[in-house]
Amino acid sequence: MSIQKIHAREILDSRGEPTVEVDLHTAKGHFRAAVPSGASTGIHEALEPRDGDKKRFLGKGVLKAVEHINKTIGPALIEKKISVVEQEKIDKVMIEMDGTENKSKFGANAILGVSLAVCKAGAAEKGVPLYRHIADLAGNTELILPVPAFNVINGGSHAGNKLAMQEFMVLPVGAASFHDAMRVGAEVYHSLKGVIKAKYGKDATNVGGEGGFAPNILDNHEALELLKAAIAQAGYTDKVVIGMDVAASEFCRDGRYHLDFKSPPHTKRYITGEQLGEIYRGFIKDYPVVSIEDPFDQDDWEAWKRFVFHVDIQVVGDDLTVTNPKRIAHGAEQHACNCLLLKVNQIGSVTESIQACKLAQSHGWGVMVSHRSGETEDTFIADLVVGLCTGQIKTGAPCRSERLAKYNQLMRIEEALGDKAKFAGRKFRNPKAK
């Protein structure tokens, strides 16, 4: 069944900033998708153009992207009468109409909004759940529930504290199911609130943009100590491990790293990539850290390679790879990381997201599906992670509705699958392994 009508509008994301929402109509019904947006963005991401009119939303409006959908993309797709189950064909039409490598003509936010809505319509057309449709598009027969990586302490560009490193996460790998993982994660989160309140006072339990706590601490070791104490207090030392998203590109200055970058610049505080790697190795030795994302700048390839060679944990590329096949291929060739962070809006279409995932997996990498800091109530990535069988997802703390929307959808999916539900657990890095 082909598309009958497409209408896009400007809505607000979880940060109060404009983003694109798309309504798509077929004979089967009405399908809606909303596009997320990042705060710490990689310079190599597909372009998400803003209007630039300082009198509207401080220049961050997306009316041009909305207009591209309503006046160009929508009419072209309706005219072509392509069935909504043909995801790749529809995405290809939009990409070719845009004609640029980084989607700068229409914008990744315009193309992705339509692509997500098409995928939802395709599932309805086939009469299957969205996660099953995505699995079919990816050629997967299995369906796997992921380990959630809860971002429970926020720093970096996600919080107004002095903490340089952006996310400190807990992963309930020892849980028996996704429902159990949610319970464990929520209990650790509440335990952490108590630990922070007892040590720093009630105002230290304010939350950041992704629902994690944002105590005004500077030392990254201190954040890890808080997590270690909260996990122990909740009684889950044997079930919960720690992940980090350093987002080091945010504090890299001329090839060196400034761990107090929110204070006035002071070159004596800058350290080299090698010194930063030593700090990470200390974290791995002293704490149950099993995953570190973006430990170095997005173009500091030598530091990445050196670090991956010396550690056996998961090293995740986000700003390094930006869900882009060329960057993934180069990263694999350089042995620069061993896991892709998959963000649909970095590449700008469902088809290219699936291709990026499969490319990373073909190199033996893990894949972690991710939200963005500017989120909406859209739950697409919950179905995506199950259909792609990546085994891991990060979509914030168990706090703030735009984060819980995804986690709650995953619980519904697990319930719907019943005894066929498979939870990645300790195999989260390679969930298909027998």
From Swiss-Prot:
Pfam families: Enolase_C, Enolase_N. Mg(2+) is required for catalysis and for stabilizing the dimer. Pathway: Carbohydrate degradation; glycolysis; pyruvate from D-glyceraldehyde 3-phosphate: step 4/5. Its main location: cytoplasm. GO terms for biological process: glycolytic process. It is an enzyme of class 4 (lyase). The keyword Iron-sulfur does not apply. The active site is at residues 210, 343. Substrate binds at residues 158, 167, 293, 318, 370-373, 394. Its EC number is 4.2.1.11. SUPFAM superfamilies: Enolase C-terminal domain-like (SSF51604), Enolase N-terminal domain-like (SSF54826). It catalyses: (2R)-2-phosphoglycerate = phosphoenolpyruvate + H2O. SMART domains: Enolase_C, Enolase_N. GO terms for molecular function: magnesium ion binding; phosphopyruvate hydratase activity. Mg(2+) binds at residues 245, 293, 318. Its cofactor is Mg(2+). One of its GO terms (cellular component) is phosphopyruvate hydratase complex. Gene3D superfamilies: Enolase-like C-terminal domain, Enolase-like, N-terminal domain. Glycolytic enzyme that catalyzes the conversion of 2-phosphoglycerate to phosphoenolpyruvate. HAMAP family: Enolase. This is Beta-enolase.
